[in-house]
Amino acid sequence: MLVLCSRSRLTSSLIRRLKDQIANVSNHRSFATSEGHRLAIVNKRSLDILQDPWFNKGTAFSMTERDRLDLRGLLPPNVMTTEQQIERFTADLRVLELTTKDGPSDTYDLAKWRILNRLHDRNETMFFKVLIENIEEYAPIVSTPTVGLVCQKFSGLYRRPRGMYFSSDDRGEMMSMVYNWPAEQVDMIVVTDGSRILGLGDLGVHGIGVAIGKLDLYVAAAGINPQRVLPVMIDVGTNNEDLLKNPLYLGLQKKRLDGEEYLAVMDEFMEAVFTRWPNVIVQFEDIQNKWALTLLQRYRHKYRTFNVDVQGTSGVAIAGLLGAVRAQGRPMIDFPKQKIVVAGAGSSGVGVLNAARKTMARMLGNDESAFDRARSQFWVVDDKGLITEKRANLDPEVQPFAWKENEISLQGLNEGAKLVEVVRQVKPDVLLGLSAYGGLFSKEVLEALKDSTSTRPAIFAMSNPTKNAECTPEEAFSIVGDHVVYASGSPFKDVDLGNGKIGHVNQGNNMYLFPGIGLGVLLSGSRIISDSMFQAAAERLAGYMTDEEVINGVIYPSISRIRDITKEVAAAVIKEAVEEDLAEGYRDMDARELQKLNEEQILEYIEKNMWNPEYPTLVYKKR
């Protein structure tokens, strides 16, 4: 009894002392927030704390913590450092490399994902420390492209719940369901309906894998606290016949809802999450084309929400397009002079088109005539060929980019002209692929691009996953020439051109932008997420590279610099939110104080609000 009383007094005393320290810090004006004070009061101990990945430290629990949390004797006696834990984990991966290095790459990547996922399930702090320190190697494992394979095999890989599932069977219950999530505060939600997963089609409930992977990158790149992120799957059924017939499928085995029924489910979900967490940011992920733009327009002026496939992909593409202008030795202001042939008119293609047109128009004066002049710089080709006003049942979103027949005939083209014909006649500066059709940029198309009027034509093969890329970098450099600028949506290795020359592969991953967009919106307290924020973010990314890097064909920076890139992008978003009078501030930084910050102070503010994977001091307090 004496020992128990003594422990109780010790714990209570420690809680009071730590609370006093935080109160003292709060009384002094500082950019620091709770992200900088790694204290966590927990309501569990003993085996319960070891089963909680948010707080479990494994062998790194100190002896005093083991006493406070009733862990003494439940762990091996040697208290390990973080570095030692990473060394043990890395050793497991190196064994995997030795045993699978000669096997198929998919098998090896999936095996790495399994090992990382097991770490994620038992110790989130260690998982994110490993991910951040090896971001170039592991980002393609936790997200694109390996996550596509994970989603395809999800029913067999599922072991432990992560995130939340809202289904059409839950209609009328979602407002209460959101309170089943244990976190009192959620800053970021990534939600998918599984209808269009990475160009793999309708994967139903398996699609939650992309939401999980995307949030892993938010934490690693933007420093969003992992305890305040929530992956969500909206299961409204599936039209995938294989899943409907599979007795082991984990989702609803009925046809996908459509029309007003679908919208009713989405409306109820959005109302529920914003009722519990009014300041949360919701990012839509891998929603089929027919709904992606509809949902974005439906919610964007009411909630803090965006669609990474439409706006994120377009922002990264704009940054790359501006970088391609720089690679020609020209200033970015010359962007409106670029001739761009676009292959693909889905949600991603339309998003890029609209963003590029707005960027050009802004450079041309931002009036009605500027938008009209900008439109004439694009030639859009889909699976039926060149799009003109003669096209029947034309999507309203694509209508502004449809050429008039009398105008296009003067160029020797007509409705439905094949991609190779368009490239031959237009001689574009940029060939932009957003078609999700692997190999679309055939040898014939690439040879036609050799006649481009540009001194340095650019190829953007942006479709994911890797097999859907419109062409490989080897094909681009070998057919078009060493001078071409090449960007892709999935990772490829640089190409050895011989004579000591390297053909740089620029992965136009939307990872360059979406973490900074989310972080900037969060820290600015912006009421909504505007198109201008994406434009500001894209321009900041385009200007991130040095002149020397750009002249060498490098238009996107190394992913190893992603946290620094994210800070820069977030700063651009915060400044834009302030300029548009949308910023309301965050925590103890109100809107008026935010307006007073210069560039250096904004970056400092961002840095001090980014979560870092360091073990907090854990203190037990009974509920």
Swiss-Prot record:
Binding site for NAD(+): 196, 289, 345
Subcellular location: Mitochondrion matrix
One MF term in the entry's GO annotations: malate dehydrogenase (decarboxylating) (NAD+) activity
Gene3D superfamilies: Malic enzyme, N-terminal domain (3.40.50.10380), NAD(P)-binding Rossmann-like Domain (3.40.50.720)
Keywords: Metal-binding, Mitochondrion, NAD, Oxidoreductase, Transit peptide
Binding annotation for (S)-malate: 196, 464, 509
Entries under PROSITE patterns matching the protein: MALIC_ENZYMES (PS00331)
Catalytic activity of the protein: (S)-malate + NAD(+) = pyruvate + CO2 + NADH
Gene Ontology process terms (BP): malate metabolic process
Residues annotated as transit peptide in the record: 1-31
Cofactors named for this entry: Mg(2+); Mn(2+)
Tagged with keyword Transit peptide: yes
Main subcellular location of this protein, as a coarse class: mitochondrion
Cellular component, GO annotation: mitochondrial matrix
CDD domains: NAD_bind_1_malic_enz (cd05312)
Subunit note: Heterodimer of two related subunits.
Protein known as: NAD-dependent malic enzyme, mitochondrial
